[in-house]
Amino acid sequence: GIRERGLMPKIEGLLSGYLGDASIGKIVLDLATEIKAANPDAIWLCDPVMGDTDTGVFVRPDIPQFMKEHFLNGLADMTKPNQFELELLSGRKMRSRQETVDTARELFTDKGCRVTFVTSLLTPDVPEDTVETLAITKDDAWVVRTPLVERKPTPNGQGDTFSSVALGTYLKTKSAKDALEAAVNTLYGLVSHMDSGALDLPLIDEQRQILSPEPVSYTHLRAHE
């Protein structure tokens, strides 16, 4: 329908996430290629959803290899792996924040990706009871540290919410730092204000956390050369 209406050149952003099958990934790749041909300024944020530390790999067995073969070529402008997914794609364990930055650059930004967000970072140099999120570009990197808020069961939609806010902010400001801060503040605010045992983020009841999120009081930013 979008193609038939001639709207491809007007698309400014594309967000992709969980893939039920590698064949769907091929459709996403073809669509991203078509959109960028129609509008070279369009931004594609690819969230390579494959698993997490507490669940292991939860996608079909062919997805990780598909990601390695097709999504590490620089076509995506932005990526958002969590620590587990970055380790899965790189084949090595992250032992420090700086190693995480270097690995993200090797896999993504050195191949043309503008920004890589690494979420759920719990390397040994991250202080206890906190979690870090990184935004990494070719020349700089920023880190935001927040208290580790664990919810059981894990709320649905956290990755989608982060990616949506990050992409939307980047489209407005073209700033990786702004996108990182907005996404982390929004997600932390939503998770902090949700009822214990709830399955979904309170996107309606806590809309203010999306429109005007509360800054995390001890957020700090740091650039890496």
How should these model regions be labeled?
Residues 32, 43, 48, 53-54, ...:
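Glycine/small-residue-rich loop that forms an oxyanion/phosphate-binding "nest" at active or ligand-binding sites
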Residues 112-113, 186-198:
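Short arginine-rich
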Residues 1-27, 31-32:
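Glycine-rich nucleotide/cofactor/substrate-binding loop typically near the N-terminus or early
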Residues 88, 152-176:
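Short, small-residue alpha-helix embedded
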Residues 58-143, 151:
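Conserved phosphate/ATP/ADP-binding segment of small-molecule kinases
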Residues 103-105, 176-190:
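Short, well-structured alpha-helical segments that form the helix of a local strand-helix-strand
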Residues 35-43, 112-114:
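A short helix->loop->beta-strand "cap" motif at the edges of active sites that frequently abuts
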Residues 219-225:
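Conserved small/polar residues in nucleotide/adenosyl-binding loops
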